């Protein structure tokens, strides 16, 4: 095997390993975000794919899909709560989430709350 063929083989293996690692990380992050939704009582008002009291996570993702400030807006809404974005029923504040968890959670919502099954 010549040098370039061997290098190409190693490059392809490294690329495949990187893609697999990203997939595993995304699945782990999705599971953690789903657990945060459950632990913080978000699922009392929200579901992944249907409106309960508040909008579904998928509806939120769709509404803000093209908004570059969506992540900051959602983080603020989760931390401070409020009303007016989706109706008259106010969302309670949830100020106990860490910055890291808040970033993970809002990212998951904006991706449409992918399933961890």
Please name every model-derived segment.
Residues 39-40, 47:
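Aromatic-flanked redox-active Cys/Sec active sites in thiol-based oxidoreductases
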Residues 2-13:
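Bacterial N-terminal signal peptides that target proteins for export
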Residues 44, 50-64, 77-104, 117:
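Axial heme c-ligation environment in periplasmic c-type cytochrome domains
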Residues 3-4, 30-32, 46, 69-71, ...:
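Periplasmic c-type cytochrome electron-transfer domains
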Residues 11-21:
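Bacterial N-terminal signal peptides
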Residues 110-116:
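Short, low-complexity, Pro/Ser/Thr/Gly-rich segments in the mature regions of secreted, periplasmic
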Residues 63-73:
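Short microdomains enriched in Cys/His and/or Lys/Arg
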Residues 22-37, 52, 63:
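Electrostatic cytochrome c docking/interface patches
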């Amino acid at each position: 095997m010549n040098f370039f063929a061997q290098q190409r083989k190693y490059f392809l293996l490294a690329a495949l390993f990187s893609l697999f690692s990203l997939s595993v990380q995304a699945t782990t992050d999705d599971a953690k975000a789903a657990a945060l939704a459950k632990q913080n009582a978000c699922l009392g008002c929200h579901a992944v794919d249907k409106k309960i009291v508040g909008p579904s996570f998928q509806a939120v993702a769709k509404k803000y899909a093209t908004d570059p400030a969506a992540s900051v807006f959602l983080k603020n809404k989760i931390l401070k709560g409020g009303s007016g974005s989706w109706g008259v029923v106010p969302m309670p504040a949830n100020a106990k989430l860490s910055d890291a968890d808040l970033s993970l959670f809002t990212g998951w919502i904006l991706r449409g709350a992918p399933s961890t099954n």
